[in-house]
Amino acid sequence: MIYQVTALVILAVFYGCYFLKMLMQQRKGIRTDQIGQGKVGFVKFVEVTMKIATLLVPAAEVISILLNTTCFWAPFRICGAVIGALGATVFVTSVVTMRDSWRAGVSKTDKTELVADGIYQISRNPAFLGFDLVYIGILLMFFNPWLLIASVFAMLMFHLQIVNVEEDFLLETFGQEYLAYKKKVNRYIGRK
């Protein structure tokens, strides 16, 4: 029962932050969810598939938590709880640091700034890192084949979004400023 409660708290903090930030930005007239909007070809495919994956994972997570599925011993589950809590913390920190520049997907029409301070000094993609850590944490706590497939698929789609959509957008939008930042900070974690 303790693992189930812990996992539900992690998910409540994680998804609560996501939806609260979207609501706060909506009140300012900012449309946060840009996934697939105005996109064509491979970019649209990546963004729409990523969105589907991010809808499948929470469903698989909640079902796994409610059924208390796992084949792992307690140390793995405890490690999963720590990783999941770290992921939620990283995600919340990234969203707060981004201020009003945070978007789900990219928008070529919104005026945003390149955020390179705070947690962005050690990760160019801390929000995606937070997603990955939460997914890995919950997976370790409630391992089952369906959750594994959904989580790995979503993490793969996040990576494709970063590499094929976001990095190109940031280079096009911020040019040399982004290149200088990219030379200093790793995609997921660490400085160069």
Spell out what each predicted region is:
Residues 107-128:
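Active-site-proximal inter-transmembrane loops
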Residues 1-109, 113, 134-169, 173-192:
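Membrane-anchoring alpha-helices and their flanking helix-loop junctions
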